Amino acid sequence: MTQYMDFEKPLAEIEGKAEELRALARANEEMDVTDEASALDAKARKMLEELYGALTPWRKCQVARHPERPHCQDYINALFTDYTPLAGDRNFADDHAILGGLARLQDRPVMVIGHEKGNDTKSRIERNFGMARPEGYRKAIRLMEMADRFNLPVVTLVDTPGAYPGKGAEERGQSEAIARSTEKCLQIGVPLVSVVIGEGGSGGAVAFATANRVAMLEHSVYSVISPEGCASILWKDAEKMREAAEALRLTAQDLKQLGVIDRIIPEPLGGAHRHKETTIASVGAALGEMIAELSAMDRAALITERRNKFLELGSKGLAA
């Protein structure tokens, strides 16, 4: 059953009524509710088009965080074959917020790395809600180095509210680990492609998304800070998150316009959480296209292009 967000309450009522009619028809075979149910379905679709055609930045944040949205493990299971998970940073521990391993994408050997939030209470706690600790970023560095050594393209799937800010993580060098992961992204001489599949939160996302090609799902978000965190700092009031979301320019559409990302992957009507298989297939197609485009480039060209891409960010605005 779909979990509805607050702005979808009118939609929930309509779809609920349609389901009630169908339940009555199933209980009584002589009852024909086809016309009534179809009318409600048409009304619900029209409302979906209106709601998702005019999503505010804050509502996009809500969609990006939807618990039923496909997560990293869903993409790995559906898109990659021969997946062999690799664990540990060879220094402290294995961070379960970060998945990674060898796999094949459309029969091409790759290294896949991503944030995993979990899909129920137990797994969310185990995955730390997708907030990686230093050992997670050091694991990612190890996997990127391995990919570079064996000339494997790297695919990163970004979905995190941010790196974990706990005391232990800070003591073990969280900021250094994020910086080293970002540095490693800039150093490897293989194609590096990244997709923001949900939340792209702060340095925790940048550490994976400093890539040759960066894509975002249509209703995902990518920002230096969460709207709630921004509101708490600027207005001393987390309830100002709507205003903060507007100011942060965190939507895929804004970031494409600003040149921060390279492409937007469309989501089906109603968001990825309503149509998981279609969304996952779209991401797979985009990944294949981006890797194929980059595979013709040699090591030096890949590194130079990636480095220049990020050094030039903001140059148009500064020049103006």
Swiss-Prot record:
Leading EC class: transferase
SUPFAM superfamilies: ClpP/crotonase
Keyword flag Nucleotide-binding: yes
Domain CoA carboxyltransferase C-terminal positions: 39-293
Reactions accelerated catalytically: N(6)-carboxybiotinyl-L-lysyl-[protein] + acetyl-CoA = N(6)-biotinyl-L-lysyl-[protein] + malonyl-CoA
GO biological process, one term: malonyl-CoA biosynthetic process
Protein location: Cytoplasm
Alphabetized Pfam families for the sequence: ACCA
PROSITE patterns in the record: COA_CT_CTER (PS50989)
InterPro entries linked to this entry: Acetyl_CoA_COase_a_su, ClpP/crotonase-like_dom_sf, COA_CT_C
Record-level GO cellular component terms: acetyl-CoA carboxylase complex
Pathway given in the UniProt record: Lipid metabolism; malonyl-CoA biosynthesis; malonyl-CoA from acetyl-CoA: step 1/1
Subcellular location, principal: cytoplasm
Enzyme Commission number(s) from the entry: 2.1.3.15
Keywords: ATP-binding, Cytoplasm, Fatty acid biosynthesis, Fatty acid metabolism, Lipid biosynthesis, Lipid metabolism, Nucleotide-binding, Transferase
Molecular function as annotated in GO: acetyl-CoA carboxylase activity; ATP binding; carboxyl- or carbamoyltransferase activity
Family statement drawn from the similarity comment of this UniProt entry: Belongs to the AccA family.
Subunit structure: Acetyl-CoA carboxylase is a heterohexamer composed of biotin carboxyl carrier protein (AccB), biotin carboxylase (AccC) and two subunits each of ACCase subunit alpha (AccA) and ACCase subunit beta (AccD).
Function: Component of the acetyl coenzyme A carboxylase (ACC) complex. First, biotin carboxylase catalyzes the carboxylation of biotin on its carrier protein (BCCP) and then the CO(2) group is transferred by the carboxyltransferase to acetyl-CoA to form malonyl-CoA.
The protein, known as: Acetyl-coenzyme A carboxylase carboxyl transferase subunit alpha
Species this chain originates from: Roseobacter denitrificans (strain ATCC 33942 / OCh 114)
